[in-house]
Amino acid sequence: MHDENTRASVRARRPAPAARVRAAAVSVAAVSALLLGACASDTDPIDIFGHAGWQGGLADAHNSASVTTNGSRELSLDWMRPLGAPTATRPSIGPDGQVTVTSTGDVGCALGSFQGATGRKRFCNSLGPSGISSTAVADTASNLYAGDDGSMSSINPNGQLRWRTPVYGVPRTPQFLPDGNVLVMTQFGQTNVLSNQTGVAVAPILDLVPPPLPLDLPNAELRPANDGLLTCLVGGPDCAVAASPAVDPSSSTVYVVLWRAGAIAPQLVALTYTGGDTPSLEEAWSSPLLPSSVTSSPVLSPDGSRVYLTDVEGTVRAYSTEDGTPIWSYFVGDRAAGSVAVSPDGIIVPAGGAGSRLQAIRDAGDRPESLWKRDDLVQQGSPALAGGSTGYTVTGNDELSLVTFDLTTGETVDTDAMPGSTGYSPGVVVGPEGEVVVPTALGALYSFR
């Protein structure tokens, strides 16, 4: 199960994814946890928020795609390795530097964990074929939380299964709630709150899109777990929840883009989480219908007063977290539909893809303010932001490069080649020691220090 990649000696720099099940059966399964291979040594709470790694797909509860760790401006290629299969999402990085990637690998190797210092494979685990659609999230003990077809699982740092819980659908990238419980939403809108230690449901299931009830429709069948996942890529009613929610720990509020049954467009929805002995979730408000489909995650401003959405047309829109009122919009262009990155001081960098140029804006209250734009740099993936006013993104055509830029001015401060890379990157991530890790969609991993 272990192997070693050949550590790159090159330190080059150059500019440049059907079972038929009746509703009665799944309604029982959805409220019971299938506890398998419990390998945790204790049941003490885990300080979920106690590390500086890249916790999940978009780094943190706010989905900010930023870290406070000071970003290096003098990077060199440290190692590179093939994944053996395509990947569609960013990796996560745990507090020990462990890099975890989901891919379309064979049945036994769709969840890969790699040593941050060397790129050596630590373990490879099985996931269902839809596991590639989300990122495995890391906690402060380097436990992982990964979703696949009809289940949510937790794996310890050695690759052993801690617990596995059935859900209805395929989980989007999970989030942690303020008390450390795991928030699991599927593309069908089923919302679960699970204990991070045992996987047991600690709150009633909230179905944002109610499934068919046996008494109302006795012959109705539930949808296969992976139904509608392709729709999540483009936006449509078959995918109620296309991407991971954002969580504001300070107000215990969850924000999600939801396409309700029968609606002609999605809405931004806020859920209030109540912890304690009897945790629960309930809807607080919903915005007006959105002007266009949204397939990326909502992102919170640093002070929690705004939610930023990017629609499939390439427009960034700001909404009030008080009641979902639309505030302003900014057209990025070129159908760049990924989530924005937001620095701790509020600078917003839109995602790349589809030919969008690297640029930055600021939320000026009732309007967006353009800070700078690089017409010469077309992003081939989503950026990451770090402390010290430093940002990273992927550019290039025939071969990709990692570009380090000054967040305040947009100026390039470093360019590092990614030898042999083509296509695009799901996005850049930054580790606890300032290491920068870049996956490519075709299945390679590059680490810079």
Regions flagged by a language model, labelled:
Residues 35-38:
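C-terminal motif of bacterial Sec signal peptides marking the signal peptidase cleavage site
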Residues 41-88, 92-449:
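Extracytoplasmic/lumenal domain signature
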